Regions:
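Hydrophobic alpha-helical segments
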Residues: 1-192
């Protein structure tokens, strides 16, 4: 299994139409910071969930992306689910989003990082599969969940908009949140 701790350059928002990505933001695009500070330490249960992950992800245009395991912790403290996420931490990576992927394994995802909490809108432009789009605030608390279907046969997905407020946007395969009993108020736990 390929697990790397993320050393991310965090960049602010980019007001543009993005595929499976942000289209509007209140964040500033000028500042970048390098950090290795974790949002939270993994518990033994979370570490066990991460150790079981072995997806063939990321691949293709995402193969060079940094990755981080992301665990969702329920309000009761229990682990809801875990995936290995490719990290989209630059304007170009956030713009591309998952639109170049034909599929993604159930144990894979993408974590979009921003320097601060902001209002953002993600779209399904050029997506080949449906997503759950999860917004989380600065401490990883989930604020919004959207279950976004793939665009129709004659659609490009640009009109499928999913707004939310957060510092992190986490995308997983559609219905992953339902299958794992994830809800608003649960928390994303990862190292960044």
């Amino acid at each position: 299994m390929r697990r790397r701790h993320l050393i991310a350059l965090l960049a602010g928002g980019l007001p543009a139409a993005l595929a499976g990505c942000q289209t509007d933001s209140t964040a500033d695009d000028a500042a970048t910071n390098e950090t290795t500070v974790g949002i939270d330490a993994f518990t033994d249960e979370e570490r066990a969930a991460v150790d079981r992950l072995d997806p063939a992800w990321p691949t293709g245009p995402y193969a060079s992306y940094e990755t981080t395991p992301v665990v969702v912790r329920g309000a009761d403290g229990g682990v809801r689910g875990a995936v290995v996420a490719a990290v989209a931490d630059t304007p170009d990576k956030r713009r591309l989003g998952l639109s170049a992927a034909e599929s993604m394994p159930a144990a894979g995802g993408m974590l979009f990082t921003y320097e601060s909490v902001g209002d953002r809108t993600y779209v399904m432009r050029d997506m080949s599969f449906g997503l759950d789009i999860i917004y989380a605030d600065a401490d990883g608390t989930i604020t919004t969940i959207h279950n976004a279907p793939a665009p129709g046969p004659d659609e490009n997905g640009a009109s499928q908009t999913y707004p939310g407020r957060g510092q992190y946007v986490f995308e997983v395969t559609r219905n992953w949140t339902t299958d794992n009993n994830v809800s608003v108020g649960d928390r994303l736990v990862f190292t960044r």
